[in-house]
A protein has these predicted regions:
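C-terminal segment of classical bacterial N-terminal signal peptides
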Residues: 20-30
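Intrinsically disordered, low-complexity polar regions and short flexible loop motifs
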Residues: 32-218
Length: 218
């Protein structure tokens, strides 16, 4: 079989990005949760999704929201939990959960929370990548080295950017200028699946992880 030229493959990727470029990101529900969803009640229309992310990438960080505790896993991020729309005390602050919203609470080393909004996917045909720059680096870029192109560019410190596209497989690399910070093996991102690339740490020793966005029903 004739191998597809890289230029043609990249053109296909660009077309997918352009067609779905106005869409943003949503978490993927694990297979077990999808199976359980055949019998569970549907997610209420007035519900939103909230997760926490440790600004220093640590596992075991917690935030209490009413009677529920969100805890970061090994990669420094928790699953999304489902909350009815409304206002909730969280740590020393208050968060607003809107219907259909996706919120990431960034927990700083001082215990303070920063709220970042992640827009949901607007199409069942979309998949996506979200990049969080929680490091001391002024900006980071997510790069596709196979194609020599940026996927998500110039994510400033303390902010997040995302991009939606058609399903596919990519090798991904995190860069700060010409400096390579981390590279991830080729992986497939399927329809209605989203992943997060999280960069933390000091400018001279940053850490980058790639995680699936997940939802827990409880």
């Amino acid at each position: 079989m004739r191998r597809q030229p890289k230029t043609h493959a990249f053109a296909s990727l660009c077309l997918a990005l352009l067609c779905l470029g106005g869409l943003a990101l949503a978490p993927v529900v694990p297979a077990a949760a999808q199976d359980a969803g055949l019998y569970d009640a549907p997610i209420p229309a007035d519900a939103g999704f909230v997760r926490i992310l440790a600004g220093d990438g640590r596992a075991g960080a917690t935030v209490q929201i009413e009677d529920r505790t969100l805890t970061t896993g090994a990669d420094g991020v928790s699953p999304y939990l489902i909350f009815k729309a409304g206002r909730y005390p969280a740590g020393e602050t208050e968060i607003a959960v809107a219907a259909g919203s996706f919120t990431t609470l960034v927990l700083g080393a001082d215990g303070r929370l920063q709220t970042l909004a992640d827009e949901p996917l607007a199409s069942p045909k979309a998949s996506g990548i979200h990049v969080y720059n929680l490091s001391a680096l002024p900006a980071v870029t997510l790069f596709a080295p196979e194609f020599g192109r940026a996927v998500v560019e110039d994510v400033a410190s303390g902010t997040t950017k995302g991009r939606a596209f058609g399903e596919g497989a990519l090798v991904l690399e995190v860069r700060a200028g010409d400096r390579s910070l981390a590279a991830f093996p080729k992986r497939s991102i399927n329809r209605r699946q989203a992943v997060s690339v999280i960069v933390t740490g000091p400018a001279d020793a940053p850490r980058a992880v790639l995680v699936d966005n997940t939802v827990v029903r409880r």
